[in-house]
Amino acid sequence: MKYKGAYKLFDAARVRTYPLRVRPSKVQVADFLDVAALRRAEIRCPTEPWFRDGRPGGGPDQSAGLQELAGHIVDCHRAGKPVVVLTGAHPIKNGQIPIVIVLIRRGVVTLYSTNVAGAIHSFEFALTGASSESVRDALPTGEFGMAFETGAYLNCAVEIGWAAGIGLGEAMGRLYCDAEFRKKVIDRALADRADTGEYFKPYEGFPFADACVFAAAYRKGIPVCVHASVGTDITDQHDSFNGAAKGATSGADFLVFAEEMCRFTEGGVVLNVGTAIMGPEVLLKAVSMAANTGRAPNGLVTGDFDVRPFVFDDDRRDESQAYYYLRDQKSVATRIPKVFGGVGYYFQGLHEATLPPLYQYVMRGLGVA
């Protein structure tokens, strides 16, 4: 689009970037959870509260609730019912994503959703084995989010995916797993660069792709849906950013997600992990679309994982209270499963504490020690 509006636009061509290799990163792939060792380890459950259908669960820890939820996941897998996982970027950045990768490879997870920040961290980990810059250190000099490869390669992948008529998540999968697609992305990103010697050029593949959830899902043939906003991601800061491409490809992903929700007519599980707004809102709209077309998610089971105490009170419904606006507690853990005759769980705590025992219970339920 050629802008013809009344206001002055920022000229993104003036933005200065730097090679990703010179930027320090705070987290390494080597720090990721060792799921093989976890399977053999003793199960340790958090002692923070857990809730079922908005009511406190019992026991000295979360073991009863996590076992119940794991049982639902195992039962759905064996019955061929969908199991969907939505996360923010932090489960990727804090090293818990190997849990999702294993469940994808085993055919348990049937669709994975995240935001563009999740795609960004996945890209940097797959390319360099490290991610997560220091915002505090980089912001004063205007270097925050300005690593060239992160912006250019991801933006070009989205733009080429747009031209190919595929979704944003599928474009990311092809970047890691399709050599021809990857070459197009790298060539386009570097086309106007006079000196490319300092840039990573992964023509032969991404060295750490095995730690990438997008690659795992693409190889398994299941969707990854990326639910994007404009102006929320470091890729939007770059001259290579194409808002039309980002919107169109993410829009396609949303329709893929909505279609997956139509498979829940006889039940299924949705896990919402660390996404307080994106996940709940995407789920709410998709569920409404499914119900509108005669394919309501009957008996839906949800699991919501976050650090905040559970304070939502669906009986009072007091819009003057702050708890009313905690969308994950309201929609994911309470209202959506209640409306469709299902069960909603909420587990308070850091993902590093709540996700490993859930994974252990699932794997043992599958008979994998």
Model-found features: residue ranges?
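Glycine-rich phosphate/diphosphate-binding loops that line cofactor/substrate pockets in enzymes
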Residues: 67-83, 216-220, 259-266, 366-369
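Active-site cofactor/substrate anionic-group-binding motifs, chiefly glycine-
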Residues: 83-86, 91-120
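Conserved mixed alpha/beta catalytic, RNA-binding, or beta-rich assembly cores of soluble enzyme
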Residues: 226-263, 267-269, 281-284
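Short gly/pro/ser/thr-enriched loop/turn and capping motifs at secondary-structure boundaries
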Residues: 117-122, 232-235, 309-311
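Short acidic, glycine/serine/threonine-rich loops at helix termini
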Residues: 95-99, 122-131, 236-240, 282-285, ...
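C-terminal functional extensions of proteins
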Residues: 256-260, 266-269, 276-369
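N-terminal amphipathic/basic leader segments beginning at the initiator methionine
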Residues: 1-45
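Ligand-binding beta-strand-loop-alpha-helix segment within the catalytic cores
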Residues: 121, 133-220, 225-226
